[in-house]
């Protein structure tokens, strides 16, 4: 879709939501339910992350074998105990009402267990050589990419784009309506859903999870309920689509170079997986 198409589409979404009033809309439970954004094609994806982790592990194992560690595992644990941090938030805060009722602004602690390394613990000798092999794997995966200029250019622009999004009068009105709604249910009047999600009152632990207190869960339920009532996530998403489309048009060459860098990276990963995987 062209940038102009994105802008027109976002305007249509904004107008449709505003005109629809309180009638029932499609329930939004995850950010993906809102649809793609213009900058998505220029950015790193969860699949990229999974494939890069696999490719990196294969390269590290190869390097470690060259350093005298022939049985180094693909998914090793560190010599000491480490904390695995889990991140499950979205740009729009919590969206799933069922999850809010049960976990508040946190998540099922069993998810953390699933992220723990499956391999054996590294020996001290392996751990001594691991950093150099990890750095070498990164260099190989990033070969041919200008890291300072081109790598994940869309991500470097995201901060400026989000500043423009927050200045959008329609979004500011939407966030104000959401804020009033949450306060009217007896909770803190947060300026936006991100402030609610990151409230220190939830006492996140070292892994990022919260304590799931009754107050936290009740606040999260009010948060999601008010988002649905006022179509906060939809309006926010539409505003982001508009601003991203404008930014892509203004910096077309840089975005194109960033996309080419991402394609180079993906091709390198595919080659590593083909040869070693």
Regions found by a protein language model. Give the residues of each.
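Cell-envelope/extracellular polymer assembly enzymes that use nucleotide-activated donors
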Residues: 20-277
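Secretory targeting and sorting signals
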Residues: 1-24
